[in-house]
Regions:
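Bacterial N-terminal signal peptides that target proteins for export
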Residues: 2-11
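Bacterial lipoprotein signal-peptidase II cleavage site
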Residues: 25-31
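C-terminal motif of bacterial Sec signal peptides marking the signal peptidase cleavage site
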Residues: 20-23
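Histidine-/acidic-rich catalytic cores in large beta-rich domains
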Residues: 32-367
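Hydrophobic helical h-region of N-terminal Sec-dependent signal peptides
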Residues: 11-18
Length: 367
């Protein structure tokens, strides 16, 4: 059965909804493509793409380049998926296609990458704790938002970003107080600027653990993992609380197309899918459910749900040991293990580029 027409109708409906919510539109030529990111990959290998862009900063080789890759791992290695990946412990963005790294972007020795997106126009949006930025395939910076880096009462951090259409970006600033912002990157206007509740005594040294992967949903609500206090909260567009779910250390919370929420709990090595009633419909504990030979050496921080129902877990790894990415089926069968410490370091975020969806439309990319 050909499901593309059905999918495209759903995509058009969501485009209309998000356009209403955000005041921006995705061009029809791109919205008509089920996998728009695949259509722009040639821009990353074009003749005008420099080896080092004017705003790139050299990143030294990873610490664990001598890590050994075990033989006979499930799946196709780097050829399993075309993908965009970043990791907390390394200083490059990697773009992979047909089993090869086809493009990188170096940001020098700095603090952690936590979020990354390829948009349908080929631009890359990422967060680097001290800032968030959007760059073009030929490595030009089109937008950047810098945090207050100096320690003290004004110190801020960014651990999450999300494109809202092609003209707007949502970020969460950990700080005193923490704030959620939606910024029009074309005009510079801050269109949403709201203080997020965080019920701990103000502590400039404690902002790092406040919030992680926050997402705007297709309904215009905000799904916020309160990492430091152990719950996920959902706010309506006016920031009234409409849903809460308690879990030990929620690093990421992603609203799925089926209406459920996929939550990654770093402390308990757990990824859990819950329905709107808070009932568990699926969960995977990497300590208990992974075979011994594929055990992560560092708990997953994020999970990506694919259109085929599979789930990909990321791991920062430890000292060049253990896998960085693992894909499992709904019945918990391992179908892919990536363990490559020669080309990569730990991995915190992955976007699979041939999965259906327009990334800048909320919920279409379930990562």
């Amino acid at each position: 059965m050909n499901t593309k027409p059905i999918y495209c109708l759903a995509a058009i409906a969501v485009v209309s909804l998000v356009a209403t919510l955000t005041g921006c539109h995705t061009p029809a030529s791109r919205s008509a493509s089920v996998t728009p990111c695949m259509n722009v990959l040639d821009r990353f290998t074009a003749a005008n793409v420099p080896e080092m862009g004017p705003d790139e900063t050299f990143a030294p080789a990873g610490k664990w380049t001598n890590g050994v890759t075990p033989p006979n791992l499930p799946g196709k290695g780097l050829a399993q998926h075309p993908m965009l990946i970043v990791g907390e412990n390394y200083d490059k963005i990697f773009l992979v296609d047909h089993g090869k790294v086809i493009w990188t972007y170096s940001t020098g020795t700095s603090y952690e990458y936590d979020d990354v997106w390829m948009l349908s126009n080929g631009n890359i949006l990422f967060s680097r704790m001290e800032y968030a930025a959007e760059i073009t395939p030929d490595k030009k910076v089109v937008w950047r938002y810098d945090c207050h880096k100096a320690p003290g009462i004004n110190h801020t951090e960014i651990h999450t970003c999300q494109p809202i259409g092609l003209d707007k970006v949502m970020i969460v600033l950990n700080g005193l107080p923490p704030r959620l912002k939606i910024i029009n990157i074309k005009t510079g206007a801050v269109e949403v600027d709201h203080e997020l509740p965080f019920s701990e005594p103000p502590n400039p040294n404690g902002i790092h653990g406040q919030f992680r992967r926050t997402r705007l949903t297709a309904q215009g609500t905000y799904l916020v993992p309160v990492f430091g206090l152990g719950y996920v909260v959902e706010y309506d567009k006016n920031f009234n609380e409409i849903w809460r779910y308690y879990i030990k250390s929620p690093w990421a919370a992603v609203r799925l197309k089926n209406g459920n929420t996929l939550i990654t709990d770093e402390a308990d090595n757990l990824t859990r899918e819950v329905n709107p009633k808070g009932e568990t419909v699926w969960e995977f504990n990497t300590k208990k459910d992974l075979p011994a030979e594929y055990q992560f050496t560092s708990a997953p921080q994020t999970a990506t749900r694919l259109a085929n129902g599979d789930t990909i877990f990321t791991s920062r790894g430890e000292h060049g040991k253990g896998p960085q990415l693992i894909e499992v089926t709904p019945d918990k069968r391992v179908v892919w293990v990536l363990q490559d410490w020669k080309d990569f370091n730990g991995i915190t975020a992955v976007q699979v580029l041939d999965d259906p969806g327009i990334p800048e439309i909320p919920v279409q990319s379930e990562h």
